[in-house]
């Protein structure tokens, strides 16, 4: 049975957040089209994820080398392992997130930090790092009020670019990206822009 992990990185209500509307539209369409799949929803804001710090960094390094961990290190590594293993076990992963202050919410950055583990999501080789999750399907669902796909702000976009870069670093080769943008920049076209994006999400979810 196919396992699908939906990762939500916005705790604003749908009526206030287009990225949440996008996430919910994709989720509903996916469930309808794939009734036999196992769908797990991970709301990062409900998880209260601790930032990566000295215990997690030292603990993951020592664990990878087979060294003994302190009690604090073991606790920190157990937190990261919980989310890392869940990610690795999923056949498909869907990320729903906004662009905030040109980048992603801190909680999503922390989550991706947990996934960034040598020997698990990538490995070191003499030629450089090699990703290890190549057969995992990834979908990135993002909303941003301005236009960042082109024009003067394109170089400043660090949300989709960051998540896509990290998934690529982990070896993902099968990625879908859906972006709704410009609804705040062009308020007279907002309804049209959002509706078109939600329709695209439903179509992509059916085939994802």
Swiss-Prot record:
Keyword Ribonucleoprotein (UniProt): no
SUPFAM superfamilies per UniProt: Flavoproteins
Keyword annotations of the record: Flavoprotein, FMN, NAD, Oxidoreductase
Cofactor-binding details, from the entry: Binds 1 FMN per subunit.
Superkingdom field: Bacteria
Catalyzed reaction equations: 2 a quinone + NADH + H(+) = 2 a 1,4-benzosemiquinone + NAD(+); N,N-dimethyl-1,4-phenylenediamine + anthranilate + 2 NAD(+) = 2-(4-dimethylaminophenyl)diazenylbenzoate + 2 NADH + 2 H(+)
Alphabetized Pfam families for the sequence: Flavodoxin_2 (PF02525)
Transmembrane segments: none
A single MF term (Gene Ontology): oxidoreductase activity, acting on NAD(P)H as acceptor
Assembly description: Homodimer.
Family: Belongs to the azoreductase type 1 family.
PANTHER family linked to this entry: FMN-DEPENDENT NADH-AZOREDUCTASE 1 (PTHR43741), FMN-DEPENDENT NADH:QUINONE OXIDOREDUCTASE (PTHR43741:SF4)
Task performed by this protein: Quinone reductase that provides resistance to thiol-specific stress caused by electrophilic quinones.
Protein name: FMN-dependent NADH:quinone oxidoreductase 4
Taxonomic lineage from the root: Bacteria, Bacillati, Bacillota, Bacilli, Bacillales
Gene that produces this protein: azoR4
């Amino acid at each position: 049975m196919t396992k699908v992990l939906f990762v939500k990185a916005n705790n604003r209500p749908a009526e206030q957040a287009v990225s949440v509307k996008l996430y919910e539209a994709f989720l509903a369409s996916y469930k309808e089209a794939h009734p036999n799949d196992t769908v797990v929803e991970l709301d990062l804001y409900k998880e209260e994820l601790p930032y990566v710090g000295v215990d997690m960094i030292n603990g993951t390094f020592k664990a990878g080398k087979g060294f003994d961990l302190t009690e604090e290190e073991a606790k920190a590594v157990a937190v990261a392992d919980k989310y890392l293993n869940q990610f690795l076990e999923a056949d498909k992963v869907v990320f729903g997130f906004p662009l905030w202050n040109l980048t992603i919410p801190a909680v999503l950055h922390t989550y991706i930090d947990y996934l960034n583990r040598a020997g698990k999501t990538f490995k070191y080789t003499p030629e450089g790092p090699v990703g290890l999750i190549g057969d995992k399907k990834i979908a990135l669902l993002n909303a941003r009020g301005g236009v960042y796909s082109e024009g003067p702000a394109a170089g400043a976009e660090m949300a989709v670019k960051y998540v896509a870069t990290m998934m690529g670093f982990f070896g993902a080769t099968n990625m879908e990206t859906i972006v709704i943008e410009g609804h705040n920049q062009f308020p007279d076209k907002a309804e049209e822009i959002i509706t078109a994006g939600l329709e695209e999400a439903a179509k992509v979810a059916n085939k994802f």
